[in-house]
Amino acid sequence: MSILGTYLETAMTDPIIPTSQLVTTTPLSQNPAVVYLARLTSALSKRTMRAALDKIAALDGQDAFTLHWAALRYQHTLAIRARLAADYAPATANKLLSALRGVLKEAWRLGQMSAEDYQRAVDLENIKAETLPAGRDLSFGEIKALADVCMNDPSPAGVRDAAIIGVLATCGVRRAELASLRVEHFETDSGKIVIRGGKGNKDRTVYATHGALDALLDWLVLRGTHLGALFVPINKGGSVQHERGMSAQAVYKMLVKRGLEAGVKEFSAHDFRRTFVGDLLDRGVDIATVAKLAGHSDVKTTARYDRRPETTKCDAAGKLHFPYHRRSSW
C-alpha cells in the first residue's frame, strides 16, 4: 500500500476514492499539473513547483503528471497535509501545500472537479511555526576577510570575485539573480542594477555603492563593457570567457573557495542576503524599503530577518543579576 494509502487507512474510516483510482490517463493538454506549471511565468518557479508536485505525488507512488489530481478529496488533502507537516519544515511544507492548491484550482478550471469538491479539498490551514530564518549573519570582519583575499589575488578572478561578493553583500541579490545579471542591467554612473525576472518573475532595482561599485567598475575594465553576462567564467590561464555567463553553481563554488582562503566558517550566498536585510533594519531603514530592495512581496518575510527584537530581549535579560563572580583561582 502507498504511503498516502496508509495515511488514509489510519486517518479516515470511509475514503470516498481509493488510492488505486489516483492514477490518471488524462491527456497532457488536460492534465491540471501541466496546465498549472504552464501558467507560472519564470523557469525557476516552474522547476520549484514541479519538484513540489512530484514530492506530493510520490506519497502515492506517482509523479506530478501521473497522479489523478482531480480525484483528490478533502480526506486525501488532509492526509497529505499531515504527512507534509511530519516530514518537512513549515516553510517547505507550506510551499508544497501552495502547489497542491494551485493544481487543484486548475483541475476545477478544467471542469474536472466540482466547485464544492474543490473548495473542500483546498480548505487546509497553513502549517504554523515560529522559526528563525535559515543560515547565519556574516560579520563585517568576515566580509572584509573575503574582500581582502580577493584584493590580494592579482589574477582576473580576484577582481571578478571581489565584485561578486560586493554585489551579494550590499545589494542582497539571490545567487540565481546574480548569475543572470547582464552588463546592460548595470548603470556605471549611478551603480543602479536592474534585477530582471527575480523570484515570482518580479523586476526590481538595487544599487551598488562605495566599494561594491568600485569593484564592479574594476571588473568591467577587465571584462569589457560589451553586452552579455555581467559575470563570466575565467579559465585556468586567466583568460576571461565571454561565451557564457557563470552559473549559480559556479558562484557557489567560488564562495566556498574564497571562504576557505579567508578562514571564514561555512556560509552560503543567502547568508549575504540575510545579513543585508538585517543590517539595513539595524540602521533604521524602514521595513517597506528593505522589502523592496530584497524583492520580498510581503514585509512579514522581511520582518523575520529583523535582529532588533533579539537585541531588545538581550538588553532586558541584562537587567537581571545573579550574585556570582568568577573565581580567581582553582
Regions found by a protein language model. Give the residues of each.
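Conserved catalytic core of the tyrosine transesterase superfamily
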Residues: 2-330
